[in-house]
Amino acid sequence: MESTPSRGLNRVHLQCRNLQEFLGGLSPGVLDRLYGHPATCLAVFRELPSLAKNWVMRMLFLEQPLPQAAVALWVKKEFSKAQEESTGLLSGLRIWHTQLLPGGLQGLILNPIFRQNLRIALLGGGKAWSDDTSQLGPDKHARDVPSLDKYAEERWEVVLHFMVGSPSAAVSQDLAQLLSQAGLMKSTEPGEPPCITSAGFQFLLLDTPAQLWYFMLQYLQTAQSRGMDLVEILSFLFQLSFSTLGKDYSVEGMSDSLLNFLQHLREFGLVFQRKRKSRRYYPTRLAINLSSGVSGAGGTVHQPGFIVVETNYRLYAYTESELQIALIALFSEMLYRFPNMVVAQVTRESVQQAIASGITAQQIIHFLRTRAHPVMLKQTPVLPPTITDQIRLWELERDRLRFTEGVLYNQFLSQVDFELLLAHARELGVLVFENSAKRLMVVTPAGHSDVKRFWKRQKHSS
C-alpha cells in the first residue's frame, strides 16, 4: 500500500501493494541476494499465479534454456492475457531471463540462484533456517498457542490505540517516528503528541493482516536509512512465515541488526520474547500469516455491526472495544458511557475537527455504514440521508474558501494606468484577483517582481 494525494487538503488514499509489486521495485542486485535464501524463494513461489508456478516447476530441473516459442506453446491462445501477465511477472522478479540459443533463437532459463534455492526449499537439504533450541533445554516459561494469540492481539492493539490518541497507550520512539514517516500520524505543534491523519483513519479501517503488511512495507522502505540490511530482515520475515506456531526458536547466530529488528517485531506483536535478553523467541500467528496474507491485503474489517445512528444525530455504539470507542470519538462528542454501550452526538464542531485532521466526510460515512447494527441494515438506505448529507455539507462548509497568497496593487491615479497594469498581469498569467470599480488587483508573489518592474518602466517613460 502507498499513500497518494487526492482531491482536497490533506486527503490521501491508501493503495495496496502486494508482495510481487514490492519485490518488483527492488534492484536486481537486492533480488539476487534475496534469492540466496531458500525461505525467500519458497515464499515468492507460493505467491505466484498458477500459470507462473506451472512454468517454474516445468523448468526447475532444466540446466539449459528452452526456446521462447516452445514455452509459448504450453498455453492455449484463449489464455494469452494470463500468459502475458505471468511472463511479465517472472521477468520483473528476475525468476527467469532470456538467453540467446545457438542459431540466434531467443530462449528462457530460470535464474540459477532462484532455481538452486527453490530446489533446496522443496526437496530439503542445505543449512537449517534457524538454530536449534535443544542446547538451551526446555523452556520453563513456554507459551501455548492461545497465549501467543492473546499476546499478539494485545501488542498490536497498543499500536492502534496510540494512533487514536488513547492516553494509556505508549510506544517506543522508533515506532512513533515510523508512524509519522508512513503518513499515518502527524505532529501539529512542536512538543504536542502526534494525531491521526486521513491515511491513518483509512489504515484503521483495514483488517489486521492488511494493516500489518502495509506497516511492514513502510518499515522495510526506511530500513536502509536506519543502517539495517534489507535483504537480511526480509529473509528473516520470510523465514518466520514458515515457522511452527507454538514452537520456540533460538537467537544464536543473529547479528546485532537482526536482534534489533527482533525487538521491533516484539513490539508489533509478531514475536514473543519474555525478556529483551532472552535467548529464545516464539513467532506469533501474525508473523506466520504475514506473507501468505499479502494478496488479500487491503480489505476492510468484517465484523458484526454495532452502531445505531438516529436522525437527531445521536449515535449508539453497542461495544466494549476501547479501540472502536476511540475511533467514534474522533468525529463525535461522547455523552454517556455504559458497561456495554456508549452514546455520542455527531456535531458540526466534532466533524469539522475530524476534517481538520485530514479525515474526510466519506470516510466517516463509510465507517458508520460498515459498522451499522443489524437493525439498521434492514432499512434502505442504511444511514439516514439527513445524517450523510449534513456530514458532507459540514465538509463543504470548511472547504468553501481557498486561500491564495498574493501582493496587492491599489491607489492608481487613473483608470488607464490600472487597466494597463491589469492587462500586463493577465498576460503573464499572474493575476489572482481584480476589482475595476475600486481600481485594485492582486498578483501572485512569484509574478510581483515582473509586474513591479513593468510598472516602473511605464512611470519613467511617461
Curated annotation (Swiss-Prot):
InterPro entries: Tfb2_C (IPR040662), TFIIH_p52/Tfb2 (IPR004598). GO terms for cellular component: core TFIIH complex portion of holo TFIIH complex; nuclear speck; nucleoplasm; nucleus; transcription factor TFIID complex; transcription factor TFIIH core complex; transcription factor TFIIH holo complex. Keywords: DNA damage, DNA repair, Nucleus, Transcription, Transcription regulation. Pfam families: Tfb2, Tfb2_C. It is found in: Nucleus. Component of the 7-subunit TFIIH core complex composed of XPB/ERCC3, XPD/ERCC2, GTF2H1, GTF2H2, GTF2H3, GTF2H4 and GTF2H5, which is active in NER. The core complex associates with the 3-subunit CDK-activating kinase (CAK) module composed of CCNH/cyclin H, CDK7 and MNAT1 to form the 10-subunit holoenzyme (holo-TFIIH) active in transcription. PANTHER family: GENERAL TRANSCRIPTION FACTOR IIH SUBUNIT 4, TFIIH, POLYPEPTIDE 4. Belongs to the TFB2 family. Component of the general transcription and DNA repair factor IIH (TFIIH) core complex, which is involved in general and transcription-coupled nucleotide excision repair (NER) of damaged DNA and, when complexed to CAK, in RNA transcription by RNA polymerase II. In NER, TFIIH acts by opening DNA around the lesion to allow the excision of the damaged oligonucleotide and its replacement by a new DNA fragment. In transcription, TFIIH has an essential role in transcription initiation. Stimulates the ATPase activity of TFIIH subunit XPB/ERCC3. This is General transcription factor IIH subunit 4. The gene is GTF2H4.
